[in-house]
From Swiss-Prot:
GO terms for cellular component: nuclear speck; nucleolus. Pfam families: FoP_duplication. This is Chromatin target of PRMT1 protein. Keywords: Acetylation, Isopeptide bond, Methylation, Nucleus, Phosphoprotein, RNA-binding, Transcription, Transcription regulation, Ubl conjugation. Coiled coil: none annotated. Asymmetrically methylated by PRMT1. Symmetrically methylated by PRMT5. PANTHER family: CHROMATIN TARGET OF PRMT1 PROTEIN (PTHR48426:SF1). The gene is CHTOP. There is a cross-link at residue 70 (Glycyl lysine isopeptide (Lys-Gly) (interchain with G-Cter in SUMO2)).
């Protein structure tokens, strides 16, 4: 047992080299290693890039890839028309022409913040994706709108009821949204619907000149291209005119 354990204890060879010198020599011997690793990585990258080049060359030689490259179109050709009308699509133009009549857009689309429809969701997204107020469509065959929600001022107390003259004084001045299918805004102050401040049953809509499809499309494009700040300023100016009437 002693003979077997002796080599573990007794050192056959000793040295006078200090630990500092020993580790310095070890460090010098290990210094070339990072260079070797770097060189080997470069070789691997070169091999991989060569493989990629060969693969790319093979792909270019394939008939299907060549046919696809020949059909490559420019950016404008792939995108097609870039005007507002092409991006909005026809359903929106049809809604604006058939339902609202073109001139009632500023108030209808922008949500009636004062004295307009309250409750449910805002009508701000009317023309950009449609609107459903508590399960009721905006227009049904051209009839007047009568949603089941309160108005901020006046309630549903339009002259002649919601089916004949609109939704009361609070909706859009003394006009309402009705008018027996003759347009969304039959009466109301000038500019936004009809002419003047008539108290009939949507007669203001009949006084409008007949607009062609191109004119309506141009009006819609011009309106949709306006910024939000510009539309807010228009609505504030209009509501400032209608507020004295709603307080009567």
């Amino acid at each position: 047992m002693a003979a077997q354990s002796a080599p573990k204890v007794v050192l056959k060879s000793t040295t006078k080299m200090s630990l500092n010198e020993r580790f310095t020599n070890m460090l010098k011997n290990k210094q070339p290693m990072p260079v070797n690793i770097r060189a080997s990585m470069q070789q691997q990258q070169q091999l991989a890039s060569a493989r990629n080049r060969r693969l790319a060359q093979q792909m270019e030689n394939r008939p299907s890839v060549q046919a696809a490259l020949k059909l490559k179109q420019s950016l404008k050709q792939r995108l097609g028309k870039s005007n507002i009308q092409a991006r909005l699509g026809r359903p929106i133009g049809a809604l604006a022409r058939g339902a609202i009549g073109g001139r009632g857009l500023p108030i209808i689309q922008r949500g009636l913040p004062r004295g307009g429809l309250r409750g449910g969701r805002a009508t701000r997204t009317l023309l950009r994706g449609g609107m459903s107020l508590r399960g009721q469509n905006l227009l049904r065959g051209g009839r007047a709108v009568a949603p089941r929600m309160g108005l901020r001022r006046g309630g549903v107390r339009g002259r002649g009821g919601p089916g004949r003259g609109g939704l009361g004084r609070g909706a859009m001045g003394r006009g309402g949204i009705g008018g027996r299918g003759r347009g969304m805004i039959g009466r109301g102050r000038g500019g936004f619907g009809g002419r003047g401040r008539g108290r009939g049953r949507g007669r203001g809509a009949l006084a409008r000149p007949v607009l062609t499809k191109e004119q309506l499309d141009n009006q819609l494009d011009a309106y949709m291209s306006k910024t939000k700040g510009h539309l807010d300023a228009e609505l504030d100016a209009y509501m400032a005119q209608t507020d004295p009437e709603t307080n009567d």
